[in-house]
Amino acid sequence: MKQTKYIFVTGGVLSSLGKGIAAASIATLLKNSGLKVSILKADPYINVDPGTMSPFEHGEVFVTDDGAETDLDLGHYERFLDESLSQDNNFTTGRVYQSVIEKERRGEYLGKTIQVIPHIVGEIKDRIKKAGEGKDILIVEIGGTVGDIEGLPFLEAIRALRLEVGKNNAMNIHLTLVPFIKAAGELKTKPTQHSVGELRRIGISPDMIICRSEKALDRDLKDKIAISCGVEKNCVIESVDAASIYQIPLNFLKQDILSPIAEILDLKNLKPNMENWDSLVKRVIAPSNEVKIAFVGKYVDLKESYKSLTEAIIHAGAALDTKVELKWVDSEKLENMESSEVFKDVSGILVAGGFGYRGVEGKIKAIQYARENKIPFLGICLGMQLALVEFARNVLKLKDVNSSEFNEKCQNPVVYLIDEFMDTNGEKQIRTAKTPLGGTMRLGAYKCDIKEKSLLAKVYNEVKSVKERHRHRYEANPKYRADFEKYGLIVSGESKGLIEAVELNCHPFFLAVQFHPEFTSRLEHVNPVICSFIKAAINYEDN
């Protein structure tokens, strides 16, 4: 297949309907039909990337192998496709304008007046084409909702691109809400009709409509939507609330979603093999066992902030045929609570990453309880750094211990800001406490060398090194390494002198890692760190 074919996914009525899940589900079916598939997310907001956005604004920032800070939908794409994506798979209005302005400053436009059409729209089209190079199919999700002023250049770009590549090489899928009105006792199609009307005014006619709803759509309702929105009857697909997002590809397959896609894009033999996926989904929905772990974090009121981590726990549960119940513990509130009361009914304690001092002492309290009571413990990113702080305070008995992130003048900064590091391209990066925040962290996949015969080595099946993804500014201070190891806190993973993992040698499972194992976990290939922690929690409960 020479010409890359495009599937453009837009959304209407309101945001957060699940365009990303729908796009990822279609991609999964196409990939399992033997096609080379990739996905791109185009975000209309003006931030260059979500790296400096609050979790309460944006949810999780997902990090790719090459260090791009991206939309959380890229996490869904990777988990469904079981492939690693890159910075080419996500861009924003801010990134587009930044690129165009830089080209203008370099004189690349030869003195022309820079306009939305053709320059901004052209940049968007170029980025879409680049993401699709070497692929049979590129699915392009346009963030936001049709009607948003920010999204107009993106919609113009996909309208123009479809015209450019020809009708058999591109299609438009529009995802809308079909709300159930309890007072009337029926589903209403009017919001969908209005949304499609708005899309048509922009110059785009959808080829397929995916209807998000609480309840199933009957045949008459689907026919009504097809007639009023100008699509074939087999191109109205329902997406009813499901027990798990991993059911969605299977639900789409049952509705024969690939037949109209194959017809529109002139594809043949789309018969996906979803047997393994189906088996895992059954374990997600109806597992044989159950275990409860405490999830200690500062953003527990907005669980989207930990999306990759909660999904990785689901993956581990599926692999172990176990439902993992999460007990959400607000680390800030924990500071004034009794640890024994909070953790009395859990079989594992997970301390997640985060930024800023709020809730830090609560996380340290949770780590101390896990260490002293020999409850399986996993610390991630800040969770590892605070494990060092807790150990230095309560085992080494050092005074005025902290991370320099929270107290620059403390006597014993067991975690500190390093001035120089090598990025994923092997280039030296220099930073200080005054360096701008955007894009200045240690980002992306780095090699971690593993200590032989350690818990970490056992977790990774005795391999000598692994690559995992990072997102942090501060590092463990090597000055204290000898003292930590003397008292039993062993460095079991390192990267060019930087401490990547620590573990306790007199504890059933106490592991803390600087990297984010959740970013590389997929339903069909769970990350070993997450899986081993859940397995340890199951063993703790059994014993």
From Swiss-Prot:
Q: Which residues bind CTP?
A: 15, 148-150, 188-193, 224
| Key words of the record | ATP-binding, Glutamine amidotransferase, Ligase, Magnesium, Metal-binding, Nucleotide-binding, Pyrimidine biosynthesis
Region entry Amidoligase domain: which residue ranges? Answer: 1-267
Q: Which InterPro entries match?
A: Class_I_gatase-like, CTP_synthase, CTP_synthase_N, GATASE, GATase1_CTP_Synthase, P-loop_NTPase
Q: In which pathway does it act?
A: Pyrimidine metabolism; CTP biosynthesis via de novo pathway; CTP from UDP: step 2/2
The positions flagged as active site in the entry are 381 (nucleophile), 516, 518
Listed under GO cellular component are: cytosol
Q: Which residues bind UTP?
A: 15, 188-193, 224
State the source organism's domain of life: Bacteria
| Reactions catalysed | UTP + L-glutamine + ATP + H2O = CTP + L-glutamate + ADP + phosphate + 2 H(+); L-glutamine + H2O = L-glutamate + NH4(+); UTP + NH4(+) + ATP = CTP + ADP + phosphate + 2 H(+)
Task: Domain (Glutamine amidotransferase type-1): give its ranges.
Answer: 292-543
Q: Write out the residues that bind L-glutamine.
A: 354, 382-385, 405, 473
Keyword presence, Transcription regulation: no
Give EC number(s), comma-separated.
Answer: 6.3.4.2
Any GO MF annotation of the entry: glutaminase activity
Family statement drawn from the similarity comment of this UniProt entry:
Belongs to the CTP synthase family.
Q: What does this protein do?
A: Catalyzes the ATP-dependent amination of UTP to CTP with either L-glutamine or ammonia as the source of nitrogen. Regulates intracellular CTP levels through interactions with the four ribonucleotide triphosphates.
User: What is the protein name stated in its UniProt record?
Assistant: CTP synthase
Q: Which organism is it from?
A: Campylobacter jejuni subsp. jejuni serotype O:2 (strain ATCC 700819 / NCTC 11168)
